[in-house]
Design a protein with these regions (language model features):
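A contiguous, basic/glycine-rich beta-loop/short-helix subdomain that forms a polymer-engagement track
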Residues: 141, 166-167
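Cofactor-pocket helix-loop regions in the catalytic cores of large enzyme subunits
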Residues: 1-161, 175, 184-324
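Long, His/Glu/Asp-enriched segments that create or flank divalent metal/ion-associated functional microenvironments
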Residues: 170
């Protein structure tokens, strides 16, 4: 949080100075660990047994929110049976974190209510990233730390405008404003005067699967180095090799472009374009270009509009970001 999200990191430090308890889970001795009540340093790749061991402790010591579980949680008995195998002692063997330290963290999270969790790319950009987040959700459900002030599972996105991009609908399952395709279709069709797809598109992992099976033929990567960033490098590279055509649009000749790209489109930096950013707390900040784009580079929106018009697309006659 302190390295990639300095504002949130500062808020966390301020909360600790005002009496909040802090658990840090990171193999490294990061700056935020200096403020931690408990610092767990698991062996890389062992997030799941560690978090499940915390859940085991909360269930075993009956630190869970009984009323919340009874009213809001399903599959309680199967979960209790499942979690029995993840004792702190068994996790100690995998994670290289002492069982007592795991118990201390679990007790602290369960009793210092309200509690919230923050996780970054160390959890999500992982071969078991989805399962890791599910473990965090389980901890929140066990303790009733969802849906109330000071609670929740808070993902810290990788770059400064991922939140804004998602909110604008850069996700196969949602429309602008983070409205689902099914719920928002009637309203958006009436406002846009155009049809909205009945079926959502593929997410990145589904695209990789579709590429490997030959269902996906081409890919356009904008500001994202797929080859270097995706968790399963071997499978990702195999999928990229299976594609017939790859466009890479970025500031730099990244690994995806260098190894697999068919066409490279140079994009302008954030210092060379107008626009907005939305941070993690959904605060919108306007950005003004400090200089003109260098060389042949252009702002992303302009490249997209020019290609769309060349393909005969309608609705791409924008002249500046404000008009968009």
């Amino acid at each position: 949080a302190t390295e990639n999200h300095p504002i949130i990191g500062a808020r966390i430090k301020q909360a600790v100075l005002e009496g909040a308890k802090l658990i840090v889970i990171d193999p490294r001795r990061i700056e935020l660990a200096e403020y931690a009540t408990v610092h767990l340093q698991p062996k890389p790749g062992t997030n799941i047994p560690l978090l499940n061991a915390m859940a085991h402790t909360i269930v075993q010591e009956q630190l869970f929110d009984r009323r919340f579980v009874e009213e809001r949680v399903t599959e309680w008995n199967p979960f209790c049976d499942f979690i029995k195998q993840f004792s702190p002692e068994s996790a100690e063997e995998f994670c290289h974190v002492s069982a007592e330290l795991i118990r201390e963290a679990a007790r602290l999270y369960a009793t210092a209510r309200p509690s919230m969790s923050f996780h970054g790319l160390g959890v999500t950009e992982h071969t078991q990233g989805t399962e890791g987040v599910m473990c965090l959700v389980n901890l929140a459900l066990l303790t009733g730390n969802i849906g109330k002030p000071g609670t929740g599972i808070n993902p810290l996105r990788g770059q400064n405008n991922v939140q804004g991009a998602a909110h604008m609908g850069c996700d196969p399952g949602i429309l602008t404003g983070s409205v689902s395709l099914n719920d928002g279709r009637p309203l958006f069709e009436s406002v846009w005067g155009a049809s909205v797809p009945r079926k959502q598109g593929l997410n990145l992992l589904e695209m990789m699967d579709a590429a490997e099976t030959g269902k996906l033929k081409a890919l356009w990567a904008i500001g994202y180095d797929i080859a270097l960033t995706n968790a399963n490098t071997t499978a990702t590279n195999q999928a990229l090799r299976s594609l017939e055509f790859i466009i890479v649009q970025d500031m730099f000749m990244n690994e995806t472009a260098r190894q697999f790209g068919s066409v490279f489109l140079p994009a302008a930096s954030s210092f060379e374009r107008d626009g907005t950013f939305m941070n993690a707390e959904r605060r919108i900040q306007r950005v003004r270009a400090a200089l003109r784009p260098l060389g042949a580079s252009k702002p992303d929106w302009q490249i997209i509009c020019e290609i769309a018009r060349a393909l005969g697309g309608r609705g791409f006659g924008f002249t500046d970001p404000e008009e968009i």
